[in-house]
Amino acid sequence: MIDQYKHKQLQIGLVSPQQIKAWAKKILPNGEVVGEVTRPSTFHYKTDKPEKDGLFCERIFGPIKSGICACGNSRASVRENEDERFCQKCGVEFVDSRIRRYQMGYIKLACPVTHVWYLKGLPSYIANLLDKPLKKLEGLVYGDFSFARPSAKKPTFLRLRGLFEDEISSCNHSISPFFSTPGFATFRNREIATGAGAIREQLADLDLRIIIENSLVEWKELEDEGYSGDEWEDRKRRIRKVFLIRRMQLAKHFIQTNVEPEWMVLCLLPVLPPELRPIVYRSGDKVVTSDINELYKRVIRRNNNLAYLLKRSELAPADLVMCQEKLVQEAVDTLLDSGSRGQPTRDGHNKVYKSLSDVIEGKEGRFRETLLGKRVDYSGRSVIVVGPSLSLHQCGLPLEIAIKLFQLFVIRDLITKRATSNVRIAKRKIWEKEPIVWEILQEVMRGHPVLLNRAPTLHRLGIQAFQPTLVEGRTICLHPLVCKGFNADFDGDQMAVHLPLSLEAQAEARLLMFSHMNLLSPAIGDPICVPTQDMLIGLYVLTIGNRLGICANRYNSCGNSPNKKVNYNNNNYYKYTKDKEPHFSSSYDALGAYRQKRIGLNSPLWLRWKLDQRIVGSREVPIEVQYESFGTYHEIYAHYLVVGNRKKEIRSIYIRTTLGHISFYREIEEAIQGFSRAYSYTI
């Protein structure tokens, strides 16, 4: 993502409260500081203008109309003795209205609030760092129990209040007067920690380097213990070791990114720019508003109520304050992720609110639909089909897609070769599909790679480069071996094709992204170009053969019978008779017989093979031995045949196979020979 400031990436992460305030804080020319949203109101019901310090305040987020303040004045109407940069009356700056797309605000929370992504996510980063069960942390955050602060030289009164309710209730008559005294607020703030503030204190006290050292020591101790023989204990030990590794990785990541763990607890809540959560007025006095506005309103109302109670803390009951803190926590949770508390929050019409997580995540979220899924020039999309005649680095582009992608290059070459005089005539030739257009198109495509992408692009092999070739039809042809990298199959999957324009992009595609350069998985190093799905079915059909074996010949179930030897172009060909399976002296003879439809693809046959000591030295007992009049004998085994003379010398060996096996073997042999030649060139 490149903008005018040359920012090349967008990163989501934790930021400090000071950074959030710096994003939203704005100092007006008169020295007034604005940026904090304190009111839940949006627009005034009479004037339809944004409320001051509300969610659409023009002082905080900028003017609705460019150069016009909330009073309706412009820079030209400012008096000579006044500052021309903003309106003295309403405090709105005379700037472009596009500032409302990126100017943020903030809400100063009356109590700390945990970020629900880091508390309830899987895995829970807060529970991982603190090494505590998630249920106990949730009970602490939502006020189910408290824990005592480690205050020096001061007595501790409560420790895990939720675990000592029975003991406290027995002394209720003597404790109740103490809790109702005005000094209890001071005692509570000194001795008791609850809510997200307690989590923040524990995170702030962490030393990440000590966490890494202690976790490493514990992991080594568990590793040295080995297996105990108790399946349950061994399983617990394995889970603990995995947890320690994740904890060390998380702490190391915090150190490397200069992020403090306590930033996972919010003190300031950012407010999105108003253009990203608009309110639209339709005909008939209908108002359509973003759900995020309603969720922000709920947070502000509950936060203001809590701030009011804290100001009157001497009169407000402690349970009421804790209940209000819980409501603020739940309101922020709903804003960030409405389904974090189980059932999603609904409005008065039983409609589920869309939280920030719902706006961001998924196929229709902000990233995949708006930022990553935008339509771009020099691209196309079509269904993929198998291209069995293609090389690994090739893809077949339909004529319709190819001429659209390379149209500008074809026009340039038409004018350069003086086939046309201007662009208009060149476009007419392309429209009329003249023969010279296809010739130039093939020349242009010969040295220009294309990029194929299948969504979702989950790893690096989701987009690869190919050399395009023209094919008939309207589908993109793809070599079946590259399907595993794309996680694609040929049941209707679609792929997008992109054209790299600059020389740098073309060089990167050739050197890094070509399919024959990505034969191994970048994650684990295993081969990624392996036969799958359609190829496996094709190889199975090619090599299935006859399952009845050699004994089928005795019952003539194959329909293959003895052959008479004929001299066909000086080659040893055998025609079928009605007794025996055919014999061939080479694979070329067998392929010739198949082309002449003398044999079938899976018909059993005998193929003369080179003398193999593994076959000769086999201790297998022959099924049958046949002798001829001149002393020649034939030893018939399950899968091969040995021909010898009367001196017991082996003259030839025949193996029992099918034409499918022969074709498969020839392909593998040619591939190995080609690899050997390429390897010898590199030495």
UniProtKB/Swiss-Prot annotation:
Q: What does the entry list as the binding residues for Mg(2+)?
A: 489, 491, 493
Indicate the segments annotated as coiled coil, or none if absent: none
Annotated EC = 2.7.7.6
Enzyme class comes to transferase
One Pfam assignment? RNA_pol_Rpb1_2
Asked whether the UniProt record includes Lipid biosynthesis among its keywords, one would answer no
Co-factor note (free text): Binds 1 Mg(2+) ion per subunit. Binds 1 Zn(2+) ion per subunit.
Concerning InterPro entries, the annotation shows: DNA-dir_RpoC_beta_prime, RNA_pol_asu, RNA_pol_N, RNA_pol_Rpb1_1, RNA_pol_Rpb1_3_sf, RNA_pol_Rpb1_clamp_domain, RNApol_RpoC1
Instruction: Give the record's GO biological process terms.
Output: DNA-templated transcription
Which residues are noted in the entry as Zn(2+)-binding?
A: 69, 71, 87, 90
Q: Name one GO molecular function term.
A: DNA binding
- Where is it mainly found? plastid
What does the record give as cofactor? Mg(2+); Zn(2+)
Question: Which stretches are transmembrane?
Answer: none
Give Gene Ontology CC terms: chloroplast; DNA-directed RNA polymerase complex; mitochondrion
User: What is the catalytic activity of this protein?
Assistant: RNA(n) + a ribonucleoside 5'-triphosphate = RNA(n+1) + diphosphate
Where, per UniProt, does this protein localize? Plastid, Chloroplast
Purpose: DNA-dependent RNA polymerase catalyzes the transcription of DNA into RNA using the four ribonucleoside triphosphates as substrates.
Q: How does it assemble?
A: In plastids the minimal PEP RNA polymerase catalytic core is composed of four subunits: alpha, beta, beta', and beta''. When a (nuclear-encoded) sigma factor is associated with the core the holoenzyme is formed, which can initiate transcription.
Instruction: Indicate the family of this protein.
Output: Belongs to the RNA polymerase beta' chain family. RpoC1 subfamily.
- This chain's protein is named DNA-directed RNA polymerase subunit beta'
| UniProt source species | Zea mays (Maize)
